């Protein structure tokens, strides 16, 4: 197994994302003077991140040490593993390593964002060995909900540093989804120095339901549907999409996709042979009405909450393309996260009101694309690591995974619970966590990268919750008088017609502040504006208990 004879001096493992959160995976491994980036993912914004499109890791540390970076190594083609690659490549030069499908999806992302940069791409597989000055890097096939997923092995003189990526064990899957247990066993027997492993389902007991069992239960449910069938699933779950295609074939139904998020990745994967599908199975969404309702399946796809949002719009007759009709059946394959439960519940009620029948779901028809407790222990037992670092999960999931590692025989002092920016150092004798590097989130709003910070988010929250209050006044500084105004405008604060007295009082307060400022020897515009903010804010809060954003506008003639 690609052992390194030359002794390495120092190893550093640094998570820049993917810890304390599910998504935004990015882990830096440094061996002596060589740096390797494992995954470069994004995260979709939380509800309170108003106006933010995506979130990526802060790579300032990588930029400061870019001469060391030997490459970006990717485990699979999901956005939380590859979504930040284009942004990273805009700031540093590095080759990109990934499976055939992963590289194809990266190239598509580069094209979509108009990043016209020459990049060296290396397509790797289960047999690839990439040789560097102080280490070798190899790969092993894993099972995830997207084909050609890989684990990554960095071979050092102390043993292998293994990053599992996101994985599960499912013996019912074959071909592009099959794990290479033989290769994993060989890696474990050769000696694993550190295991960096997926913690997403570390709190879920047992094993995942095998995918062939899920498909069988889906078939039983689908055969009972007499009318149009709408299946809601994530665009990233290629296994589930293939299962629906399989069942449509068996039930003699045509399939149409509703959701832009899938089109690009599906078409790429289909052209590359990752989907088993007959030529005449798919029909455009605008041709669905040409077929009897009992001869079609609509797959409503998207990222994050998009599939549920689409169903909600369809139920309320607000969707641009199609709406729910009495007699439709809806089947949800997505699992509602804690923050989505209320939204999903409301959507189900809307669907029923619109006349749809909800196909009852059971745990038998749900499987995560991440390993449950017994699968995680299986990976630990196969690899037999000296050190263990649980990643890709909320902190409580990392803790649960750490307990599993201890149960599997890893000594407690050799298990590291890390946060973003933590540096796990090994100097040849012991591994310690004794350092921190710059880390955090970079918020992307439209085409702006990193120009939305906490202050901007605070202002957006203020606008969303309490609105905006604008005071406009025109001055004649030469004659020291108010030439026009004050004029008060507000949006999202109070209903003007019902608050005329308050607005008139605010107007008089502005006039008073400005006239007082004009009496000073030297007129200080900044002081007048600040006084307007402070006193108007106090007045409005006393009367409404709300604090709108106050914008004083002073112009001169």
From Swiss-Prot:
CDD domains: RNaseJ_MBL-fold. The keyword Coiled coil does not apply. Keywords: Cytoplasm, Endonuclease, Exonuclease, Hydrolase, Metal-binding, Nuclease, RNA-binding, rRNA processing, Zinc. GO terms for molecular function: 5'-3' RNA exonuclease activity; RNA binding; RNA endonuclease activity; zinc ion binding. Zn(2+) binds at residues 76, 78, 144, 166. Substrate binds at residues 366-370. This is Ribonuclease J 2. It comes from Staphylococcus saprophyticus subsp. saprophyticus (strain ATCC 15305 / DSM 20229 / NCIMB 8711 / NCTC 7292 / S-41). InterPro entries: Metallo-B-lactamas (IPR001279), RibonucZ/Hydroxyglut_hydro (IPR036866), RMMBL (IPR011108), RNase_J (IPR004613), RNase_J_2 (IPR042173), RNase_J_b_CASP (IPR055132), RNase_J_bac (IPR030854), RNase_J_C (IPR041636). PANTHER family: RIBONUCLEASE J, RIBONUCLEASE J 2. It comes from the Bacteria. Its EC number is 3.1.-.-.
